[in-house]
């Protein structure tokens, strides 16, 4: 959607006609929308988000946004999960707090098999450093990490959850971002 308000909304833009009308006509904004995929911008995550850009036409009255505004072209940087994973030397061999328990791992495997037998797609997802991308990091990740588990078979261990720093990197936070909170649960809830 560019320029003047249109009554037919494109199927790939999940925004109501009322919201578009309010932005473009009532508030006199030039508005454009686009769905962007995180993986196209260097984040190894299979996540799409709607971005909305708006400019006040009264404030920018001399600008023809239909011809001036251009969305940035995604660099389509080749990504892999290994780019955001901690160096194994930073995760102590004795520090297994990110490795899931045997009980949880057995439960994940059992539920995945049950759902597979029913024809459902539910189950944990296992990734390694060569994986091009992960699933979307959910708000409930702190509970069991099932949507993104890191394979540790080469270390003879059960899978592990991402560390909080890895979660920050996956979401595109810079290295300077301070990962801090009262508890591990609160840290994971930041992402």
Please provide the spans of the model-predicted regions.
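C-terminal target-recognition/interaction regions appended to catalytic cores
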Residues: 99-191
